[in-house]
Structure formats: C-alpha cells, structure tokens
C-alpha cells in the first residue's frame, strides 16, 4: 500500500549533515516505505515506546538512525536522525523524536 512520506524540517537539517552515501541509503529506504508501507528487519526496528516509533538502521562507516512514525493510514513522518556513537540508542534522541511526533498528532 503506497504511503506519503513527510520529512520534518529539523530532520532534513540533521540528515543533510550526513555523508552522501548515508543520505543515498536513507533515500532508498524512504522510497521503499513509500511503495510498500514498511521495511523489514534488520533495516528497521519498532522502539518500545508508548507512541508507534520506528528506526531505520543504517550501517556505513558507523551506525546511523532515522526515526519515523506512521501518522494515520497513509502518512509516514520522518522525525529525526543521528549518527549513533554508542551501542544503545540514547534515550534523549528517542524522546526528541517522540516530542516531534506529538507536534503532528
């Protein structure tokens, strides 16, 4: 089922700081989200939050994460992105994505 993918302006600024190869992978994954409505493991993971928050998982000279959520049946919102430097995703970054999601709900 085709979906519309919206990207938060703040997420665009974060993603634009990433290396070109990472941005290309993000674009490819968001295109798959548009066409199929979802991604499979290991490329995505649902986070254990009260909100339906997911992360796109990218490996390229490090680990990168892009947080997104489903908003209704037809929209996906890209909320934030980061270069992950620790094994566990920082809770601060998850909370930031949740806060941004609440702005859309």
What are these regions (language model features)?
Residues 1-62, 72-76, 85-105:
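Basic, Lys/Arg-enriched alpha-helical interface segments
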Residues 79:
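Conserved catalytic cores of phosphodiester-cleaving nucleases, focusing on short active-site segments
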Residues 82:
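Residue-level signal for short, function-critical loop segments
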């Amino acid at each position: 089922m085709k979906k519309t993918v919206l990207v938060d302006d703040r997420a665009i600024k974060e993603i634009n700081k990433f290396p070109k190869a990472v941005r290309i992978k993000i674009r490819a994954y968001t295109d798959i989200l548009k066409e199929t409505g979802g991604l499979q493991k290991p490329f995505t993971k649902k986070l254990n939050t009260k909100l339906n928050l997911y992360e796109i998982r990218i490996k390229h000279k490090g680990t990168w994460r892009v947080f997104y959520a489903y908003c209704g049946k037809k929209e996906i919102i890209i909320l934030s992105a980061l270069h992950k430097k620790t094994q566990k995703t920082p809770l601060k970054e998850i909370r930031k994505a949740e806060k941004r999601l609440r702005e859309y709900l």
